[in-house]
Amino acid sequence: MEQDDKFLFKEAVMAFDFKKEYKEFYMPKNTPAILTVPKANYIAVRGKGNPNEEGGAYQQAISVLYAVAYTLRMSYKTDHKIEGFFEYVVPPLEGFWWQENIHGVNYADKDSFNWISVIRLPDFVNQKDFEWAVETATKKEKVAPEKWKTVIRHPIKKL
């Protein structure tokens, strides 16, 4: 195999993309449907407050989620080797929003929003790998680890 062939072969190998492999969850049709979502790994951060607040809890939570997600995604370039690792595209951010004691939504009172924001992780990520990513991202990003929560192989509770 010549040098150019190796380059072409390497470029042809695509990273696993959750959006493409699980279209029913990430690219829904225009008609409502009830789906059964299988158990999966998620990084989750729970909070309360206005999502538009500059430097607020929500914006901090998003930076925490992405810091950990990308630390895990790029782990193959470090000394930390994750068993069963394969390259993947970090899935999109997902969010669950609600307001207590309000029927419907009161958009005028964004400070009363409760939220859980999550990013799905591949099944090969275990608790030890997650803890490594939290520690590594904390050193790198200087984000407060007390704001971090994980939901490993646990479905989000229906509210």
Predicted regions and their residues:
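A solvent-exposed interaction/effector surface
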Residues: 7-159
